[in-house]
Structures are given as structure tokens and as C-alpha cells.
Amino acid sequence: MNEEIIIDVQGLNLWYGENHALHNVTLPIPNRKVTALIGPSGCGKSTLIRCFNRMNDLVSGCRVTGDILYHGQNINGTGADPVDLRRKIGMVFQKPNPFPKSIYENIAYGPRIHGIKNKRDLDEIVESCLHKAALWEEVKDRLHDSAMSLSGGQQQRLCIARTLAVNPEIILMDEPCSALDPIATSKIEDLIEELKKEYCVIIVTHSMSQASRVSDYTAFMYLGDLIEFGETRQIFENPHKELTENYITGRFG
């Protein structure tokens, strides 16, 4: 791989209590590309993506060994600040989760927490992030309406805009389209294509067609193991492992 590596996973193991959920995973994540994590339910893909911004810290009994290097620094090392990490590595969840506030306040909330108080600066951030999330034209005349009044697809794009507002480098997406209709899904996929021009995007998806459409690289996981990783075209057209081929062709899943 000739790409710049922004996250380098080295020998990662994770346990939930006695359950060994990830087994010695080693995976390079390239910057300004889309990497898809695929595999059947329970394979560890959501567990892995939550390691990247230490969301698993919040799970009782979770234990991790191995290294996750972000710009060469181990995110699990002593002195690493998980709050700062989650600003740099944002998360978009399966179900849209806007705050019960106005559209404007959903986006301004994060920058305010990080010390930005000037209204003109906040206005610029809100407009810029809504443009990047392809939502500005739809909401520019109702910024002070409740975010809960938006459609599901609009709410998910608002959540993406909210993530962008604190200036991350990496955007994690855990099945971001599973609760959306085909039209809303298409808009999110178009947005992902634009986002990778500025950000690293890592997406968990159950949809083989979505992974093949939106990603540059694909990692196939099964029962906590990373089975195969490579360029998406190679994974889908010429997988090196029989297990990968069986999953992609629908022989199991």
C-alpha cells in the first residue's frame, strides 16, 4: 500500500469479560480514503471501529491488548486523552441521534464546548458544515427549527455535519444507512464520496453492494478474525481467501 497510513492497528485483541471478541487484528487504515468493514453479524466489525475512538472504554469488563497507532502514537497509551481523541475521530451511529435542539444548535454545540463563542465564527461553522453534509440548501431557511422535525435521512446528514463541526480527521460510520430508505441512502453514499477528499472515512456495512460502491479498501472479518484486507475491487473480484469469496457470493452470512 502506497497510501499515507493514518491509523495502524497492530496485534489488537479485545475481550468483553471472558468473551475474546477480536483476535490479533493487524490493519493499516489509509488517509483520505474510504475503508469498509464487512462480515456477518457478530464478526467484530462494530467492536473494531469503536476501538478507534475508544468507545469500548465505556463498556464494563472490556480489556484491550496490542497497539492502535494514530499518527504514530498509541491511542491506548498512558497520557492519551480519550476526549480529545473523540474530537479528532468522530462517530456517526446506525440510528440518527440529533440533539433535541435546533438544527443550528446541533452543530454549534461542539465548537462551543471547545471554546468558540463568537456568533460570527459559529455562523460560519454551521453554514460550512451543512454545505459539506449536503444539507444547507434544504435547511438554510429554518436553522432554528427543531432537528427532530427533519426526515431520517436529513437527521443523519445533520449528525455528519455535527461531527464535522469540531474539525475531525477521521469519520467513523457504523451502518449509517441501515435505518434509511434507498433515496436517503443514495444521498449519504454521495456524501461519503465527497467527504473522502478531506477526511479518512471508515464505514461498517452489512451491504455488499454499498461496500463495493463507496469504499476504496475493504476488510472482511469473521468471528473476531480479520480474514482479508485489500483494495475493494480486488476483494470483490479476486479474493485471495476462500472464506472471503464464500461470504461475498452469499454462500453464508
UniProtKB/Swiss-Prot annotation:
Any one Gene Ontology BP term: phosphate ion transmembrane transport
Family as reported in the entry's similarity comment: Belongs to the ABC transporter superfamily. Phosphate importer (TC 3.A.1.7) family.
Coiled coil: none
Chief localization: membrane
PROSITE patterns: ABC_TRANSPORTER_1, ABC_TRANSPORTER_2, PSTB
Catalytic activity: phosphate(out) + ATP + H2O = ADP + 2 phosphate(in) + H(+)
Compartments, as annotated in UniProt: Cell membrane
Gene3D superfamilies associated with the record: P-loop containing nucleotide triphosphate hydrolases
Keywords carried by this UniProt record: ATP-binding, Cell membrane, Membrane, Nucleotide-binding, Phosphate transport, Translocase, Transport
EC number: 7.3.2.1
Ranges of residues in domain ABC transporter: 7-248
Membrane-topology descriptor: Peripheral membrane protein
Organism ancestry: Archaea, Methanobacteriati, Methanobacteriota, Stenosarchaea group, Methanomicrobia
Name of the protein this chain belongs to: Phosphate import ATP-binding protein PstB
Gene: pstB
Residue sites binding ATP per the record: 39-46
GO molecular-function terms, A-Z: ATP binding; ATP hydrolysis activity; ATPase-coupled phosphate ion transmembrane transporter activity
InterPro entries, per the entry: AAA+_ATPase, ABC_transporter-like_ATP-bd, ABC_transporter-like_CS, P-loop_NTPase, PstB-like
Subunit and interaction comment: The complex is composed of two ATP-binding proteins (PstB), two transmembrane proteins (PstC and PstA) and a solute-binding protein (PstS).
GO cellular component labels: plasma membrane
Role, per record: Part of the ABC transporter complex PstSACB involved in phosphate import. Responsible for energy coupling to the transport system.
